[in-house]
């Protein structure tokens, strides 16, 4: 998820936090009962030896990565087992699980962040499970995965029935099934099956009853204008933009139940913040008119500030002014906020939106004030100085992305300061830290948790190297920097040099074992 979809990220976090246990695969809290695993005949037990073969031998495999001590895992367990039992006769589907306290590396490889994590493997390819955590939903979701990506419709009755079954359906009308554009549509359907249900009509005469010319695509939906025909070029970019942009209402509410629909919107996404206890009739009417005029250029949604008061501040607004509006542009990797001191009216907002789309508005960067003095061995970056201190620096730069409330970050602080002190006289290396909770960082930098530590090499700032080693000694970082830096440097003392070599020797011996 793009970092600048900040609202969506927070909504996703709040939606998921109730269904996952915090923890790390390295920490087994020890109150699980592993013996019972072997009594479950319908749930496959996976480990490093059989994992890859198991997820590849079935058309669809659902894997639960869990920890025995996790309360949410214990709650899910009987529902999961019942789903496995109900699906046991279907040899194309498998339900399995991995105990992350026993198979740490396997869980790390699958990027497990909390428990339980559910992943669907379809023909060996991994996708997050996005259904409800109930027996019924698990069964339905996996059975749905087996259905063809594209249905073939042969009559008006077929089309009407298809529309009734699916709130959003996309139908391609073709003369034949060997046209290159038919192949393009089929591939697009396979890659966007979660956005809508796809079908085709392969009949020139029948197609002409629904479209002016073939091939063409029509989107049917249960809201706003029910039938929308594609009018752009018949290529992937245009079709995806058409489908994503028309799969949501002209001005719909975004909340825990709907945020997924907005996740992959390809055009700028405008968030209107309102107070649901007030009369918003005129505001909604005005913004709906703006949304209509900008159709294809932007997608609009509204957020109830009463339900999600922290969302506006996460976008960089004060959270105290309603109505307010913010635009998130994935393409520009930028966020734009309407000045809360300005009068909120149809004219002012309409012009501002037009200027945002036209590239006339400067993006908002969440940033703390730049430190008056930044002479300490560990440099402090903020949102407005990150580019200067890190990306534009000619040095190899080690950066700690932290949050002030993070306990692990607090434990690391004296060690990181010691690292800065130790390397302060090495001209080619800079040690930097940034409060990533209070400052924006470039959206292509993936921060999965705090602290995240990365080395931005002097000759390759676009591909930082993540530090995955121990954090209990500053010399661990020294060794990491020396091994990966673009510019060679000498350590401050031969004694420490010996220490690093000793660690290398120890590591080599460990690898041999």
Curated annotation (Swiss-Prot):
GO annotation terms (biological process): protein folding; response to bacterium; response to endoplasmic reticulum stress; sexual reproduction
Basic and acidic residues bias: start-end ranges: 500-513
KW Metal-binding (keyword) present: no
Localisation per UniProt entry: Endoplasmic reticulum lumen
Active site: 70 (nucleophile), 73 (nucleophile), 406 (nucleophile), 409 (nucleophile)
Enzyme class, broadest EC rank: isomerase
Gene Ontology cellular component annotations, sorted alphabetically: endoplasmic reticulum; endoplasmic reticulum lumen; extracellular matrix; phagocytic vesicle
Keywords tagged on the record: Disulfide bond, Endoplasmic reticulum, Isomerase, Redox-active center, Repeat, Signal
UniProt KW Isomerase keyword: yes
Signal peptide as annotated in the record: 1-20
Pfam families: Thioredoxin, Thioredoxin_6
Catalytic activity: Catalyzes the rearrangement of -S-S- bonds in proteins
Domain of life: Eukaryota
S-S bonds: 70-73, 406-409
Motif stretch (Prevents secretion from ER): 510-513
Residue ranges crossing the lipid bilayer per the database entry: none
EC number in record: 5.3.4.1
Family to which the UniProt record says this protein belongs: Belongs to the protein disulfide isomerase family.
Alphabetized PANTHER family for the sequence: PROTEIN DISULFIDE ISOMERASE (PTHR18929), PROTEIN DISULFIDE-ISOMERASE A3 (PTHR18929:SF132)
The protein, known as: Protein disulfide-isomerase 2
Gene field: pdi2
């Amino acid at each position: 998820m793009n970092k600048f979809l900040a609202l969506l990220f927070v909504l996703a976090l709040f939606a998921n936090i109730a269904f996952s246990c915090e923890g790390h695969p390295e920490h087994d809290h020890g109150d699980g009962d592993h013996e019972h695993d072997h009594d479950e005949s319908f749930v496959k037990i996976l480990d490093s030896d059989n994992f890859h073969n198991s997820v590849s031998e079935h058309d669809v495999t659902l894997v639960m990565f869990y920890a025995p001590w996790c309360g949410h895992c214990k709650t899910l367990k009987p529902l999961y087992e019942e789903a496995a039992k109900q699906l046991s006769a279907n040899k194309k589907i498998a339900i399995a699980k991995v105990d992350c306290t026993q198979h740490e590396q396997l869980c790390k490889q699958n990027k497990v962040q909390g428990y339980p994590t559910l992943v669907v493997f379809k023909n060996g390819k991994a996708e997050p499970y996005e259904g409800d955590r109930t027996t019924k939903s698990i069964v339905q979701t996996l059975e749905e995965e087996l259905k063809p990506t594209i249905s073939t419709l042969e009559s008006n009755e077929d089309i009407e029935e298809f529309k009734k079954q699916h709130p959003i359906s996309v139908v391609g009308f073709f003369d034949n099934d060997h046209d290159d554009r038919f192949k393009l549509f089929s591939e697009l359907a396979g890659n966007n099956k979660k956005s809508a249900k796809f079908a085709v009509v392969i009949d020139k005469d029948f197609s002409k009853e629904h479209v002016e010319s073939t091939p063409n695509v029509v989107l049917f939906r249960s809201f706003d204008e029910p039938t929308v025909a594609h009018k752009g070029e018949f290529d992937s970019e245009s079709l995806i933009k058409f489908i994503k942009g028309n799969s949501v209402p002209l001005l719909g509410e975004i909340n825990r139940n709907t945020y997924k629909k907005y996740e992959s919107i390809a055009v700028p996404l405008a968030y209107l913040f309102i107070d649901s206890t007030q009369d918003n009739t005129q505001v909604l009417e005005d913004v709906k008119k703006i949304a209509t005029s900008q159709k294809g250029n932007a997608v609009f949604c509204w957020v109830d500030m009463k339900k999600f008061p922290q969302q506006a501040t996460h976008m960089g607004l004060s959270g105290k002014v309603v109505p307010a509006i913010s635009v998130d542009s994935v393409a520009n990797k930028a966020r734009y906020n309407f000045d809360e001191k300005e009068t909120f009216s149809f004219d002012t907002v309409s012009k501002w939106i037009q200027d945002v789309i036209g590239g006339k508005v400067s993006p908002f960067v969440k940033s703390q004030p730049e430190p008056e003095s930044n002479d300490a061995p560990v440099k402090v970056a903020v949102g407005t100085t990150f580019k200067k201190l890190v990306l534009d620096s000619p040095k190899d730069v080690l950066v700690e992305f932290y949050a002030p409330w993070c306990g692990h970050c607090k434990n690391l602080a004296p060690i990181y300061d010691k690292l800065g002190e130790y390397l302060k006289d090495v001209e080619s290396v800079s040690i930097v830290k940034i409060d990533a909770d209070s400052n924006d960082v470039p959206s292509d930098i993936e921060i999965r948790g705090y602290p995240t530590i990365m080395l931005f090499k002097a000759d390759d700032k676009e591909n930082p190297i993540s530090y995955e080693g121990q954090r209990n000694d500053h010399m661990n970082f020294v060794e990491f920097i020396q091994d990966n830096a673009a510019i060679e440097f000498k350590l401050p003392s031969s004694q420490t040099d010996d220490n690093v070599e000793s660690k290398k020797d120890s590591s080599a011996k460990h690898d041999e074992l």
